[in-house]
């Protein structure tokens, strides 16, 4: 299975900064050992599209609505992402769930809509620290996958990104043993649902100094990287493991 190295820039980088970043990154991208995907903020999607023309580097949106257009103030259109040449949409990130109240039913609608446009949804799942310490990790991930993929087409691509919420932007990293155990659980859940070919990415304070050890764990098919993807050299090192 091919590796995928995805960068979630969240609400960072202006269009100007986006162009400057790709001017640097394209010189380093040849070292990547898998597919590279960037999720810039909505305001920088067009800059990413222009910068990445003629390259094999993919890009997508951090969120979308489950309709192409309409009276949905503040939402993003996956159709526009497609028109710009994008390939992916990030769906169900823990910040969308926690800050904006997105539930599994809405996530499922978005996954199905994105697939219907011929784009690839990258479905984010993960447990909180309280859920892990209460031994509820498996149940939480099983529920998120069951409900989030409820309307998904098994014949079309989908990528799953496991991000323990307690390790996002905190500097805390799941141990290789925790990653191995949880990714094996996620694979088994996906297999039972008929999505055994879906790549499973790990996210949660991934950095150049821990990426090589994490990528060796079973069913880790790449990374979804936050802060460490904002610097070209740092992310290129991660994408080359």
Curated annotation (Swiss-Prot):
GO molecular function list: triose-phosphate isomerase activity
Annotated EC: 5.3.1.1
Record keywords, A-Z: Cytoplasm, Gluconeogenesis, Glycolysis, Isomerase
- Is Isomerase among the key words of this record? yes
Magnesium listed as a keyword: no
**Residues where substrate binds:** 8-10, 169, 205, 226-227
What's the main place this protein lives? cytoplasm
Per its UniProt record, what PROSITE patterns does this chain match? TIM_1, TIM_2
Q: Per its UniProt entry, what is the enzyme's top EC class, as one word?
A: isomerase
Catalytic reaction annotation:
D-glyceraldehyde 3-phosphate = dihydroxyacetone phosphate
Q: State which residue ranges cross the membrane.
A: none
The pathway where this protein functions is: Carbohydrate biosynthesis; gluconeogenesis; Carbohydrate degradation; glycolysis; D-glyceraldehyde 3-phosphate from glycerone phosphate: step 1/1
The SS bond pairs are none
Look up the coiled coil feature and give its residue ranges: none
Which residues are named in the active-site annotation? 93, 163
* A UniProt-annotated Pfam family: TIM
Subunit relationships: Homodimer.
Q: What is this protein called?
A: Triosephosphate isomerase
């Amino acid at each position: 299975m091919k590796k995928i190295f995805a960068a979630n820039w969240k609400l960072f980088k202006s269009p100007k900064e986006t162009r400057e970043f790709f001017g640097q990154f394209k010189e380093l991208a040849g070292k990547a050992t898998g597919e590279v995907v960037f999720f810039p903020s909505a305001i920088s999607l067009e800059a990413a599209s222009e910068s990445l023309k003629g390259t094999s580097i993919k890009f997508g949106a951090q969120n979308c609505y489950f309709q192409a257009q309409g009276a949905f103030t503040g939402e993003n259109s996956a159709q526009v992402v497609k028109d710009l040449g994008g390939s992916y949409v990030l769906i169900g990130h823990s910040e969308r769930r926690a800050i904006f109240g997105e539930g599994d039913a809405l996530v499922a609608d978005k996954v199905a809509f994105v697939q219907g446009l011929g784009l690839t949804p990258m479905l984010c799942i993960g447990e909180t620290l309280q859920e892990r310490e209460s031994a509820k990790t498996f149940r939480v991930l099983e529920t998120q996958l069951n409900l989030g993929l409820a309307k998904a087409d098994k014949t079309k691509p989908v990528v799953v990104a496991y991000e323990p919420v307690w390790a996002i932007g905190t500097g805390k990293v799941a141990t290789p043993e925790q990653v191995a155990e949880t990714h094996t659980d996620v694979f088994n859940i996906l297999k039972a649902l008929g999505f055994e070919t879906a790549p499973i990415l790990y996210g949660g304070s991934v950095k150049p100094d821990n990426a090589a050890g994490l990528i060796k764990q079973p069913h880790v098919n790449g990374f979804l990287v936050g802060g460490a993807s904002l610097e070209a050299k740092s992310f290129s090192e991660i994408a080359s493991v």
